[in-house]
């Protein structure tokens, strides 16, 4: 089928590239000329495991192209996916400016049978509003909702082997087109529902996962006070099939481009409908406070005095497997430390350049290796769960630090191994 993606950000790129790999004829449109030029040279603007391989295959098979020109080629599209950003504004309300900008640019070029698919995360009711908007301008297109559930760091696998595909439609024709598009993914479960429910599923899913993270983080705080083991607790709870083990790793809080934004948007939605959803408010508050709580733990290990201390931060992305630093707890921790006159030496294996764009400070030094970041520091903070941190020569690092203290906010190192080397080692959920 002929498919066009409007917006070549994270979702549009991954979806478009894999759709091309699966055999569809795909055009990815974006206003950023520099990005488009690089993509046509097989240079990705994001880090995502294996995506470069699929990009190469799709381009070489001539089933994928990138452009910034909205032209009559759109007339051949069977479906147009809107995959632009929907950032938060004000008190968490989703800003749909880019969605409507995309609609405005394409509706005069596409044929009457083309299906407009909203893959961007939008509040319930948005698709119906878009249909009304198009009708007010004399156009009558089918509009469907098809939210994405891609996890950064494993997005390729998530697209090829999804748990489910959610489709929100108001007629059988739209459903048939989407089923045909996803036909190469055999054995996939489809959830076919109305437009509003489809839109709400995305918000509810992300908010529920965020709730699991906030809950296990608070259980880690309890373990710290009473001497429990948070890893064993997470395992014991997660092996219950009703709960599941995913998103039960205690840490410095959730971040990224989805969870913080989506739970705020859902909270905004329920408040607009005069529903007092206390769970959402509690999760938002808990996660907002989490980086400050982590800094308090660092201060405790340094006898309450942070001013002038040298601290190594290992990991800057909001999680491993991505270069994304948006709403990263690690970045939030660094900012708090800098405000307390701390000298920070930071390293991340993938996200260093994005971190530099996000945060600069006279007391912040970005290093090209974890070992260099740890030289002569008062404490080492592991803020992101990169596997390479487990493989470091910690004996070498022990000989380089000023004070052999590690606080592991991701619980990735082995307590006994670190202590045998000579480190004072603390993990999330352990007594300080």
Curated annotation (Swiss-Prot):
Catalytic reactions on record? UDP-alpha-D-glucose + 2 NAD(+) + H2O = UDP-alpha-D-glucuronate + 2 NADH + 3 H(+)
List where this protein forms a coiled coil: none
Key words, A-Z: NAD, Oxidoreductase
Superkingdom of origin = Bacteria
Pathway, per Swiss-Prot/TrEMBL?
Nucleotide-sugar biosynthesis; UDP-alpha-D-glucuronate biosynthesis; UDP-alpha-D-glucuronate from UDP-alpha-D-glucose: step 1/1
Q: What is its EC number?
A: 1.1.1.22
| Active site residues according to the UniProt entry | 258
Top enzyme class of this protein? oxidoreductase
Its BP terms in the Gene Ontology are:
polysaccharide biosynthetic process; UDP-glucuronate biosynthetic process
Under the heading SMART domains, the entry gives: UDPG_MGDP_dh_C (SM00984)
Q: Specify which residues bind substrate according to the UniProt entry for this protein.
A: 148-152, 202, 206, 247-251, 255, 319
A GO molecular function assigned to this protein is:
UDP-glucose 6-dehydrogenase activity
Q: Which residues bind NAD(+)?
A: 2-19, 30, 35, 121, 152, 261, 326
List, alphabetically, the InterPro entries matched: 6-PGluconate_DH-like_C_sf, NAD(P)-bd_dom_sf, UDP-Glc/GDP-Man, UDP-Glc/GDP-Man_DH_C, UDP-Glc/GDP-Man_DH_C_sf, UDP-Glc/GDP-Man_DH_dimer, UDP-Glc/GDP-Man_DH_N, UDPglc_DH_bac
Q: Which NCBIfam families match?
A: NDP-sugDHase
Q: Which family does the similarity line name?
A: Belongs to the UDP-glucose/GDP-mannose dehydrogenase family.
**Name of the molecule in the record:** UDP-glucose 6-dehydrogenase
Tell me which species this is from: Rickettsia conorii (strain ATCC VR-613 / Malish 7)
Gene, per the UniProt record:
udg
């Amino acid at each position: 089928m002929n498919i066009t993606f409007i917006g070549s950000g994270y979702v549009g790129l991954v979806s478009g590239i894999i759709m091309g790999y699966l055999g569809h004829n795909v055009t990815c449109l974006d206003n950023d000329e520099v990005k488009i030029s690089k993509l046509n040279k097989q240079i990705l603007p994001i880090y995502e495991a294996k995506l470069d391989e699929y990009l190469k295959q799709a381009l070489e098979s001539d089933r994928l192209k990138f452009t910034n020109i909205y032209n009559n080629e759109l007339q051949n599209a069977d479906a147009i996916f809107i995959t632009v950003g929907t950032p938060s504004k004000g008190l968490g309300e989703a800003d749909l400016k880019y969605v409507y900008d995309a609609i405005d640019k394409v509706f005069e070029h596409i044929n009457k049978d083309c299906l407009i698919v909203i893959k961007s995360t939008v509040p319930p009711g948005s698709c119906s509003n878009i249909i009304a908007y198009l009708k007010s301008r004399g156009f009558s297109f089918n509009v469907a909702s098809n939210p994405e559930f891609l996890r950064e760091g494993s997005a390729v696998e998530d697209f090829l082997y999804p748990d489910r595909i959610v489709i929100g439609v108001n007629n059988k024709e739209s459903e048939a087109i989407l089923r045909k598009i996803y036909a190469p993914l055999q054995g996939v479960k489809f959830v076919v529902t109305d437009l509003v429910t489809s839109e709400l599923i995305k918000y509810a899913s992300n908010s529920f996962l965020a709730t699991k993270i906030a809950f296990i983080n608070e259980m880690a705080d309890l373990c710290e006070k009473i001497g429990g083991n948070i890893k064993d607790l997470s395992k014991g709870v997660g092996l219950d099939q009703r709960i599941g083990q995913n998103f039960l790793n205690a840490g410095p809080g959730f971040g990224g481009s989805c969870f913080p934004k989506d739970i705020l948007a859902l909270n905004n939605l329920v408040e607009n409908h005069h529903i007092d959803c206390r769970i959402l408010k509690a999760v938002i508050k808990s996660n907002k406070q989490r980086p400050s709580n982590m800094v308090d733990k660092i201060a405790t290990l340094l006898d309450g005095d942070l001013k002038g201390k040298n601290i190594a931060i290992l990991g800057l992305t909001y999680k491993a497997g991505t270069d994304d630093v948006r709403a990263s707890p690690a970045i939030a921790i660094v900012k708090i430390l800098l405000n307390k006159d701390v000298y920070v030496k930071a390293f991340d294996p993938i996200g260093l350049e994005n971190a530099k764009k996000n945060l600069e400070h006279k007391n912040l030094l970005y290093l090209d290796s974890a070992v260099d970041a740890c030289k002569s520091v008062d404490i080492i903070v592991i803020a992101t769960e990169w596997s390479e941190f487990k493989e470091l020569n910690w004996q070498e690092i022990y000989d380089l630090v000023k004070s052999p203290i590690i606080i592991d906010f991701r619980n990735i190192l082995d307590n006994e191994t670190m202590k045998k080397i000579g480190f004072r080692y603390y993990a999330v959920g352990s007594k300080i």
